[in-house]
Amino acid sequence: VRGGWVESGPLDDESRIDRAAAGRVVLRLGRMLRPQRRAILRAVFLLIFQTAALLASPLVVRYAVDAGLVGKSGRAINIAAVVYLILAVTSALLGRSVIWAVSRIGEDFLRSLRARVFRHLINLDLGFFEREKTGRLVARMTSDIDALQELVSQGLVMFVQNALIFVGTLVVMSLLSWQLTLCTIIVVPPVIFASLWFRKRSNTAYLEVRDRVGTNLSTLQEGLEGVRVVQAFGREGGFIERFEETNEAQYDANIATVNIATRYFPFVEFIGVVGLAVVVGAGSYFVDRNILEVGTVLAFVLYLNNLFEPIQQLSQLYNTVQSAAAALNKLFGLLDTPNSVPEKPGAIDLPLAGAMMVSGVAFAYGGGPPDTDGVSHPLGPIVLNDVSITVAAGERVALVGPTGAGKSTLAKLMARFYDPIEGDVSFGGVSLRDATRRSLRERIAVVPQEGFLFAGTVRDNIRVGSPEASDADVDAAVDALGLREHFESFPEGLDTEVRERGSRLSAGEKQLVSLARAALADPTVLVLDEATSNLDPGTELEVERALEALTQGRTVIVVAHRLSTAQRCDRVAVVADGQILEIGTHDDLVSRGDAYAALFAAWTRTE
């Protein structure tokens, strides 16, 4: 902590993977691209023809010089000019075709990958999302995909084309003159060594820039989001000082990359000039002795650029390939993450009605598969231990107890957000482990503590409970809960836009939408996870009335924060230290004078 501010640490270096991992990524990528192999082959053939056109151009110049200028033939010069123009046009057209073909292949792959990752993510168990940070998952779909985007849109073409140009140039130069080729190769090793140095230094420097940019943006975002607190406590000066420090660090990191670039590129240009001087000097020697013609020497001069530039391009491309390989490795790791609550092969539908039975259940958080960074999470302390309870069809049972007792965990097990490590949870005699996911979600609905709304209208958010429902069905669900008048008071009624996360509505209004959503789903079992604990005074009464209407005729499990809710239930189960201490009606438990009576007395004093 410096100056009252918590300093952000550097970002993890996630842009490098070892060769073995890179090899596995390439093999898996090849398998994923197999359906597009014909398109890839077409793109490769186009690229080969384009490279051939580029490599043929210096040979045309050689012909123009030897046959036209030296041979004093205007016809030869005209032929060379026409052929050179044809090659230039052909190369441009082929280049456009190559870029289009490769871009289509890449974009099709990325579209498929994004969809595949999202489908996998949206179906993973709740425990996965409690282990993983949302920001890290978003990064998988944004920055990691962006790293791949750069590779498929530019990198692949550059890599293949530069490799072809380098090899093709060496072959053509060797065929033209092995003597000048040997003279040229002398200056190649310094360029290669310089490029290897640049690759290593620039990768480290660019990672540092990325870290500093992230820290600077984090500082900026934190300051803007907390500007009220900053101004309220007069901390503008301290925050400005902190931002200036992170901004200066970003500046230093950028200057370091500039320093590396200014040492590498001028050196390579200098070596290119040395190579040119060597070729011209040796060429004039061979021309004087009639070993070579002037056109051949000039062609060599033109080929020199084709020899050095690919080395530079491939060196700069290394970081792009490395980042893309690391991004693919992380995305593949995400795709390989198993679901801890999978649907069994041969799963069966839950019955339409029946009792909810929890039998000898034990549960602890953690112990799932490694996260997307390969970090394992050992099994945590036991949260529930040997818990058994039966909720009859149509019965309303409240789960009460102190914070951290295991109430919400028990409710989540009843909805099969998790599977117990011991014991079983069943509905109508069918284990939830054996049930199809579709029937599980149709029979059991959960209303959480905070109603989450998606961008769209109120009607759209209610329809999440049953996407196929008509407007009339939505209206009927709203009317069944007595919420018509409240929703009609909105500017556009049920068609009012709620914006992202329902920012236009209060907490209570969001919960009303959640209740209407549950009513539209029409479940047999309703799990209310402290659904009345985070309400504003203006909607509290309406939420309670809507809840009363929603729970009629349904099996209800309520995680009760307010004991007034427990009073309205058929039975109350007191949960403490991961066990059910007592269970019975409200009146019976109060008369016993044990745990529930103490909770109720304490709650009564605070109300």
What are the roles of these predicted feature ranges?
Residues 16, 24-27, 33-36, 98, ...:
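Juxtamembrane loop-to-helix connectors within ABC transporter transmembrane domains
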Residues 31, 35-38, 126-127, 143-152, ...:
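An intracellular "coupling" helix at the cytosolic face of ABC transporter transmembrane type-1 domains
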Residues 39-49, 84, 154-208, 279-292, ...:
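Transmembrane helices of ABC transporter permease
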Residues 235, 259, 276, 306-336:
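Cytosolic ends of transmembrane helices, especially the final helix of ABC transmembrane type-1 domains
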Residues 350-607:
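ABC-type nucleotide-binding domain
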